[in-house]
Every structure is written in structure tokens, then in C-alpha cells.
């Protein structure tokens, strides 16, 4: 057998099914427009909701930290890699999320893996929304707990599962705060109400809600006025926050336990000084410059309204994630490719990221987009969709 022949066969099948994707290379800093293959294109695919990736305050904080503390830390947190700034960031995150404590992980993905794999045992059950992020799914797979999946945001189905799982040590309901492929918000008040009625715990992944929802971007828990009633909040520092990493926030007991049992935290080198300092500065920007969130929502409302007027089919998004439903993988890829040739970077999302036949162009609006950029992007989308007979 040729080396990895079985892998090549699978890759060939992906190409045949139009689910193969070529990574596009960006040649400038992230922003409302970027350069791809030497051409300036409007960026509608990044998670840089507030434009903080290139905010002068974050860039300057990163520069200062690198010059003073070096390029890296040289150790894991539990041995010799905890700098003063790491503790400062965690205190700031805990205050921001209105919890007793917080712990920073190397990524949002490893945060979910670390939390779920460490706190769940064979005595427990984890109850997960069917459209939760891949990191939640993989985190659950690492546990010995029983697993149940409830239909997407279906509270009757969630209650059915809760009623049938009364004999476990802990029942943990896990949900995305904002669902990344559709842009809808979890019905968190209803989830919390059921959890309290059936003595269950709640964990919310606010990857796409931190910096977007709630006062100053505190997330879905704060958005719904549920501070103190959700047991575990996780999120990223790489989307609206604009840098890198993930975090868990909750009680002091939870965070102390994760420090000792969270394997991704225990066995990964701590974040470089530049990354940590930029994250600290990002939280300060959220607290001190609310105009970024205001502009984000203004741009989102404008863009959605114009797409609907075109006759395009959108998901029931409630956030700056604005997916245009296409259906067939080949058509979604064709539209994405055509948009790029005309100056709009809007990535297609196909199987296995979404279900087969549910392919889409997922656009994400940011605070940095100007009206002129949005209008230009809208015109390109309109003409390309018409050319491909999608409207």
C-alpha cells in the first residue's frame, strides 16, 4: 500500500463532493479590507467583530510587553510560567464576567476540552445542544460521563432529558451562547429556569458573545440578566477580544479545581507576554470605548436589511453573524469564489462544518466596516447571486 493512500482517497472524495477548501492567504493585517493575492478585498469572514486586532492600544501594549518581558515565558503556568500579568488578566476577566475567578487557557478549543474532561466523571451526565461547537463535542468525547443531546434550542426536549436523568451525581447542561453557524442566541433564561427546577448545572460557551452581547460585551449571561445563575462561563480571547486564547470563569472552587486538573492548562506553555498584555488592554477598551459595539450593531442591522431586500435567504440570526443559505455545496463554493474575484472575501461553509445540503456563505459584520464598504459588498453579492441564479 502506498503511504497514506487511504487518506488521499478520502481527500479525493472531498474534492468530488465539493467539500474541499483551499485556505486563502491574507497578506496584510486583519481589518475591514485585506489583501489576497495582491488584490484589496472587503473582509466579511473574520471574527474580528470590534476591529480590536489592530487597535492602537492593543498593539502598543503588546510591543511594550515584548520589549520588557521577552518573546515567550519558557514554562507552563504551574512551574515557572506564571507572570504577574497572567494573574492580572484572570482577575480582570473574573470582574468582567462578574464571577469569583477565571482561568486562561491557550485557546477556546482547549478551554472546552479542559473544563469538560476534568469535571465530568462516570457518575455524571452531560446534556448538550445538538448544534454546539466542535470543541464542546470533542470535550464531551474525552469524558467518561453519560451523554445526551437535545434538539436545537428545544426546551421541551431538554426537559424530557432532564426528567430521565435524575440519578446522576451531576447533570451538566452545555450550550453555545451564540451558535456560530446560524448566529442565533441560546434561550438562556429558559435553560437556567429548567436547570434550577431540576437541580442541574449550566455551562455556556460565549465565544461569539463576549464583546458582542451584554453590557460592554460581557456576554449572553449578562445580556439576559443572569449574572450569578450560570455555573460555568467559557469564551475566547481571539474573536471580539482580538488576540488569542480562551478562558473559563466561575466560582473559586471551580477555578482552583481546573488549575489542578485541567490538562490543556497544566501541560501547555503559558501565553507570551505580548498576547497577555494585549488581552488585558482589550478588556479595558471594551469598558472604556462602547462606541465599537454600538457601531457593530448599527452595521449589522443595515447589512441584514439590505440582504433581505435582495431576496436572499438568511438564517434566523440575532447577531453580527449573517449566514446566507445556499443549500448545495457546489453552489456555495461557486458563489464564494465569484465574490472573491470581484473583491469580497466571504467564505463558504460546507459539510462537515454544517449538515449536507445546508451549505452557506457565512458573512460576519464588524464595527470597522464603513457604509461605503458595506454598500460595495452588497452590490457585489447581489450581482454574483443573480449571475448564479440564486435570486
Curated annotation (Swiss-Prot):
Keyword Zinc (UniProt): no
Record keyword Membrane present: no
GO annotation, biological process: biotin biosynthetic process
Enzyme class: transferase
Matching PANTHER family: CLASS II AMINOTRANSFERASE/8-AMINO-7-OXONONANOATE SYNTHASE, LD36009P
Family statement drawn from the similarity comment of this UniProt entry: Belongs to the class-II pyridoxal-phosphate-dependent aminotransferase family. BioF subfamily.
Protein name: 8-amino-7-oxononanoate synthase 1
Amino acid at each position: 500500500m502506498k503511504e497514506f493512500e487511504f487518506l488521499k482517497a478520502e481527500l479525493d472524495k472531498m474534492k468530488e463532493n465539493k467539500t474541499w477548501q483551499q485556505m486563502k492567504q491574507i497578506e496584510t493585517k486583519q481589518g475591514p479590507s485585506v489583501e489576497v493575492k495582491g488584490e484589496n478585498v472587503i473582509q466579511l469572514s473574520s471574527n474580528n467583530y470590534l476591529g480590536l486586532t489592530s487597535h492602537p492600544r492593543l498593539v502598543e501594549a503588546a510591543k511594550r510587553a515584548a520589549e520588557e518581558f521577552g518573546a515567550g515565558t519558557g514554562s507552563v503556568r504551574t512551574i515557572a510560567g506564571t507572570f504577574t500579568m497572567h494573574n492580572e488578566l484572570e482577575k480582570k476577566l473574573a470582574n468582567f464576567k462578574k464571577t469569583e475567578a477565571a482561568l486562561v487557557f491557550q485557546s477556546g478549543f482547549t478551554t472546552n476540552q479542559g473544563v469538560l474532561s476534568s469535571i465530568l466523571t462516570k457518575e455524571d451526565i452531560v446534556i448538550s445542544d445538538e448544534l454546539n461547537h466542535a470543541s464542546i463535542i470533542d470535550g464531551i468525547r474525552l469524558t467518561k460521563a453519560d451523554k445526551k443531546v437535545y434538539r436545537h434550542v428545544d426546551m421541551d426536549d431538554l426537559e424530557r432529558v432532564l426528567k430521565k436523568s435524575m440519578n446522576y451525581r451531576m447533570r451538566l447542561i452545555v450550550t453555545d451562547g451564540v451558535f456560530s453557524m446560524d448566529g442565533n442566541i441560546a434561550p438562556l433564561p429558559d435553560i437556567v429556569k429548567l436547570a434550577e427546577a431540576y437541580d442541574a448545572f449550566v455551562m455556556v460557551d460565549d465565544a461569539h458573545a463576549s464583546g458582542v452581547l451584554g453590557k460592554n460585551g460581557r456576554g449572553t449571561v449578562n445580556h439576559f440578566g443572569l449574572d450569578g445563575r450560570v455555573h460555568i462561563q467559557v469564551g475566547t480571547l481571539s474573536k471580539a477580544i482580538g488576540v488569542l486564547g480562551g478562558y473559563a470563569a466561575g466560582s473559586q472552587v471551580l477555578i482552583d479545581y481546573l488549575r489542578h486538573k485541567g490538562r490543556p492548562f497544566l501541560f501547555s506553555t503559558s501565553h507570551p507576554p505580548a498576547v497577555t498584555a494585549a488581552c488585558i488592554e482589550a478588556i479595558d477598551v471594551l469598558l472604556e470605548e462602547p462606541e465599537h459595539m454600538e457601531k457593530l450593531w448599527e452595521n449589522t442591522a443595515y447589512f441584514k436589511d439590505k440582504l433581505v431586500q435582495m431576496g436572499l435567504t438568511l438564517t434566523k440570526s440575532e447577531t453580527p453573524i449573517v449566514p446566507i443559505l445556499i443549500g448545495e455545496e457546489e453552489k456555495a463554493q461557486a458563489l464564494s469564489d465569484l465574490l472573491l474575484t470581484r473583491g469580497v472575501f466571504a467564505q463558504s461553509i460546507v459539510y462537515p462544518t454544517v449538515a449536507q445540503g445546508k451549505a452557506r456563505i457565512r458573512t460576519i459584520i464588524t464595527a470597522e466596516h464603513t457604509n461605503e464598504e458595506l454598500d460595495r459588498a452588497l452590490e457585489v453579492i447581489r450581482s454574483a447571486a443573480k449571475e448564479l441564479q440564486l435570486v
